[in-house]
Amino acid sequence: MHSSGSSFAKAGHEPGPPLWLLAELTYRCPLQCPYCSNPLDFAKQGAELSTAEWIEVFRQARELGAAQLGFSGGEPLVRQDLAELIAAARGLGYYTNLITSGIGLTEARIAEFADAGLDHIQISFQAADEEVNNLLAGSKKAFAQKLAMARAVKAHGYPMVLNFVTHRHNIDNIERIIELCLELEADFVELATCQFYGWAELNRAGLLPTRAQLERAERITNQWRDKLAAENHPCKLIFVTPDYYEERPKACMNGWGNLFLDITPDGTALPCHSARQLPVQFPNVREHSVEHIWRHSFGFNRFRGDDWMPEPCRSCDEKHKDFGGCRCQAFMLTGDASNADPVCSKSAHHEVILAARRQADEAPLGLGELQYRNDKASRIICKA
């Protein structure tokens, strides 16, 4: 890792520190969720960073001011050096969290991670129904393993943090999802409707809930919030909606290259999880220092500030609130990452969003029609 290379830093747009570092340790995963955010072509990605290379990334990012480090994937548990990486991150002063499906987790590994200094474990579920969960995961044993490991995480003194990715095929069971979380003594529950990137975008026609489904689910969630608050119950419910039913875009990542730094398994550095699909050459930690990447690389400066914005964003009085929306969504839905996010009603491409809403109401795909995330499918997509 070195610092050589041209500087594309923009005067007046000096970034702060990359406070949140995400280490996507691997794209390997025993599950095949059809809403995975990993790139469609994950099967052709390069060799994973070694233990030593990851630790050097952690060190350099910490020097820049990174404070929180997430271990993600794929499934990070397939990395046999995970405890060593956790210990190194802890020694550098990071707050660390493990984002996992729970597949591959054991009580022994939980204890090992605790000894290494891991602060937080989040376990994801596909559904509260065993059959649907296992179908979406592609494993007949997934649901039972998740239940066992959720209980084990709690027993080892960790806060119980659960994530349910919701979509049109499970969101109507939101009440049962919440009940299951309470049975597991969850402290925090993220009820996160699919965000349509990667495999989720490929399967959007089969995953996007209708507006009526979302409104019902949010209403039930709010009723449970009121009930839990009245009982002084510690469980917190977080409801995340897709922006497909909004008229203004989200402030994606709180601005491009502003707070978030993602390092992919092969060392490519990204300003968000999905940016790899853009027609932008992003830097790699094997070739450049993290400091150079964050401050000077073309990829991280491409959409900083607002000088890149065309109309209607350039003259919009909301541009410093939403930063023009999501660059990846603009690229996926309009073919040009510089365009206004089509979620915005001011966008010339807003009809794409309206059409997706109509499709959710009129012609959705069934569970059996989804393209599941696996190595074979990725290789076929790579050849297409």
UniProtKB/Swiss-Prot annotation:
SUPFAM superfamilies recorded: Radical SAM enzymes
Binding sites annotated in the UniProt record for [4Fe-4S] cluster: 29, 33, 36
Domain of life assignment: Bacteria
Name of one Pfam family that matches: Radical_SAM
GO biological process, one term: pyrroloquinoline quinone biosynthetic process
Region forming the signal peptide: none
Cofactor(s) needed: [4Fe-4S] cluster
Keywords (A to Z) from UniProt: 4Fe-4S, Iron, Iron-sulfur, Metal-binding, Oxidoreductase, PQQ biosynthesis, S-adenosyl-L-methionine
CDD domains referenced in this protein's UniProt entry, alphabetically: Radical_SAM, SPASM_PqqE
Reaction(s) catalysed by this chain's protein: [PQQ precursor protein] + S-adenosyl-L-methionine = E-Y cross-linked-[PQQ precursor protein] + 5'-deoxyadenosine + L-methionine + H(+)
Cofactor details (free text): Binds 1 [4Fe-4S] cluster. The cluster is coordinated with 3 cysteines and an exchangeable S-adenosyl-L-methionine.
GO-annotated molecular function: 4 iron, 4 sulfur cluster binding; cyclase activity; iron ion binding; oxidoreductase activity; S-adenosyl-L-methionine binding
Pathway annotation: Cofactor biosynthesis; pyrroloquinoline quinone biosynthesis
Membrane-spanning residues: none
NCBIfam families documented for this protein: PQQ_syn_pqqE (TIGR02109), rSAM_more_4Fe4S (TIGR04085)
Subunit structure: Interacts with PqqD. The interaction is necessary for activity of PqqE.
Family designation: Belongs to the radical SAM superfamily. PqqE family.
Protein role: Catalyzes the cross-linking of a glutamate residue and a tyrosine residue in the PqqA protein as part of the biosynthesis of pyrroloquinoline quinone (PQQ).
Protein name, per record: PqqA peptide cyclase
Organism: Ectopseudomonas mendocina (strain ymp) (Pseudomonas mendocina)
